[in-house]
Each structure stands twice: as C-alpha cells, then as structure tokens.
Amino acid sequence: MMKMLTGTSAGVRLLLSPAVVRQQATITTAASRALPPTAASVILVSSRRQYATTQESSKRRSVTPFNDDGHVPWTRLSTGEKAGRAVQQTFNFGLVILGVVLTGGIAYLLFTDVFSPESKTAYFNRAVDRIRADPRCVALLSPGDPKKIAAHGEETHNKWRRARPIAATVEKDNRGVEHLKMHFHVEGPRGSGVVGLHLTKQPGHWEHEYQTFYVDVRGHQRIYLENKEAEVAAAKKGGNKEFKFLGVKWN
C-alpha cells in the first residue's frame, strides 16, 4: 500500500513502504526483460538503490552524545544529531585540555621540588653527601664506613625512612631575599643527630647561598660545615674592610 502521496512541480512522487518497493522491484525486473540490456540494468540498479536507502534509513538508530561513534557521516545527521555530536566533541576536547594542564602542573611540581638543582630535594641530597664526606661527622656517626650514615625527615609512625617528610620552609623578607630553612635527622651505627640548614637567595639570582649548615650530635659540640656569620665576624676582627654577607658586599 502507498504510505503518502505528495505533489511536486515536476509531477507526482510516491513514497512507498519496503514491501511495496520489493513488489515494484519484482514487477520492474519482469518488465525489464522486454527492454534492451542497458535500459534493464539501469532500472534494476535504480530500484535496488531506492530499496537499500529506504531500508538503511529505517534501521539506523538515532545518534546521541552518548552513543555516537562517528560512524554515521555528518551529512546524514539531523539537526539535533549534529548538535549532539558537537556537544560530544566539545566535551572530549575539554578533557584533552584538562589533561594537558594537569600534566604540565605535575611536571612543574616535580621539576621545582625534585629535579631542579635549586629544589629542596637537591639541597637535602647534597647536604647528606657533605656529611658523609666530613671526617668529623663520620667519626661521631659511623667511623670507618660513611655509607652507613642514613638521613630522613621528621619522625612518624611509618617505619620506612624515605616516607618521613623533610621539614623545610621558604619565605621572603622585606628586602625580597628568599630564605630556605631545612632540618632533618641523620643516623649511624654509633650515634644520631639533627642537621640544620639556612640558605638565602638574592632577588634576581638563581642560586642559594649557605648561611649556616650544622650537625648536632647528642653529647658532642655542634659541627659547622657552613657558618657565614662566623666568617663575617672573623672578617671584621681581621680588619678586612670588605666582606660578603647575604650575597652583598659590605664595607
């Protein structure tokens, strides 16, 4: 049966159901036997295309932002389906941008706190290396084997030393000088102690400068590996008219 009859300027066009289309194709095939081969082929191809298009359109499910896999071409989407695909692609693009931003933030934090030569972790590692290389510290902590000197952060319930946080603060004074202060613990077969560091960085400079770097071992005198205040006092006492303190030359 015919579904719908519409009038056009060129004539009358019938919109047929799939059953009618198949019946029409059968009739057309029978009629085409009386036609020349070329004309019959054209009629058969046209009928099959019309049937395939009608069948495919009736079977295709509606495209939404949740089930769109990009298989249906853009030109075959309805206005609502195009809007849904645009929403899906905008959401996916936003996720990509968010991932890039988060990755960049994590990379920046890793560089500034771990991999940078001026990071807290870098100064912690260099301080431990200097303690292991100092004969005074080795004699009090691990005589004869400096490699057995271990360092860790604040005491916690976690028995894994690497998981203990290092106490460190960074602040600027009213002159714009950055102060990095850090302290951690060292242990050896013979004894244990506390390490303190104070470094400064002048405005416009990239490197920190040691102000104090000491090791306190219980029952022993403090060991200074760096003591800028003592150097300044010695310079004043020796009559040196020019000395350096906090990265600035003083007269």
From Swiss-Prot:
InterPro entries: Tim21, Tim21_IMS_sf. GO terms for cellular component: TIM23 mitochondrial import inner membrane translocase complex. Residues 52-90 are mitochondrial matrix. It holds the Pfam family TIM21. The keyword Lipoprotein does not apply. It is a single-pass membrane protein. Residues 1-51 form a transit peptide. One of its GO terms (biological process) is protein import into mitochondrial matrix. Essential component of the TIM23 complex, a complex that mediates the translocation of transit peptide-containing proteins across the mitochondrial inner membrane. Required to keep the TOM and the TIM23 complexes in close contact. At some point, it is released from the TOM23 complex to allow protein translocation into the mitochondrial matrix. Belongs to the TIM21 family. This is Mitochondrial import inner membrane translocase subunit tim21.
